[in-house]
């Protein structure tokens, strides 16, 4: 990941020359690659859980993809509106993305908002609400994209390639599901995916249980 900023175009290379990656292990055994950069008051973190869209129920492809779009739509005691107000107020960016093998996420914020950012990330990952209105809004957006893709030659070719290349393997199923499968996805499917995949034992990055962070943050924190 990268968090690098300078008002001097010649300062960046010197900063990079001094960059040192620290290997940290948390009290619960999660390894992180940490780079401290005091030139900008920003924190950036990337992480991944093993078990992406390949973990979707066979009859409901698209579950993991919907989860990635719903974790910011209300979690814990915060509904959709309140959650987004807190993100905006504290200049916090949370992103989630799913592939066949991984559920990935990223956090970016200013240093002064670190505690709030990590707390909002925690409740997003551990206490998503999946309220009916939010689920249906997300479902409608997914279906709109799928309808568009159903007439797009490139999308059709990509899906056909996956089917031919992988046959009955979960890799043959598109990450965002099918027009026929997405309407069948229920809140319990979403909750079940979170229970199975969003867990400490699945934290991984590039072959190990790692996350990557960079910015103006002390290693001890």
Describe every region a protein language model picked out:
Residues 3-13, 167, 171, 175, ...:
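An aromatic/glycine/proline-enriched structural segment found at the starts
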Residues 14-46:
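Mature N-terminal segment immediately following signal peptide/propeptide cleavage
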Residues 33-35, 39-69, 80-126, 139, ...:
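M16 family metallopeptidases and their MPP-like homologs
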Residues 194:
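Conserved, carboxylate-rich catalytic/transport cores that coordinate ions
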């Amino acid at each position: 990941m990268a968090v690098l900023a300078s008002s001097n175009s010649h300062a960046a290379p010197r900063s990079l020359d001094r960059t040192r990656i620290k290997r940290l292990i948390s009290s619960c055994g999660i390894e992180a690659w940490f780079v401290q950069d005091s030139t900008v008051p920003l924190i950036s973190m990337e992480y991944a859980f093993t078990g992406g869209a390949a973990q979707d129920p066979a009859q409901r492809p698209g579950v993991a993809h919907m989860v990635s779009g719903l974790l910011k739509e209300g979690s814990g005691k915060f509904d959709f509106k309140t959650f987004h107000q807190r993100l905006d107020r504290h200049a916090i960016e949370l992103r989630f993305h799913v592939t066949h093998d991984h559920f990935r996420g990223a956090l970016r914020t200013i240093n002064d908002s670190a505690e709030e950012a990590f707390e909002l990330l925690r409740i997003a990952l551990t206490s998503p609400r999946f309220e009916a209105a939010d689920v249906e809004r997300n479902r409608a957006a997914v279906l709109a994209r799928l309808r568009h893709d159903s007439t797009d030659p490139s999308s059709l070719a990509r899906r056909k390639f996956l089917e031919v290349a992988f046959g009955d393997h979960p890799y043959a199923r598109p990450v965002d599901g099918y027009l026929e499968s997405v309407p069948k996805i229920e809140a319990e499917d979403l909750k079940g995916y979170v229970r199975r995949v969003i867990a400490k034992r699945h934290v991984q990055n590039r072959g190990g249980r790692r996350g990557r962070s960079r910015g103006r943050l002390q290693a001890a924190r």
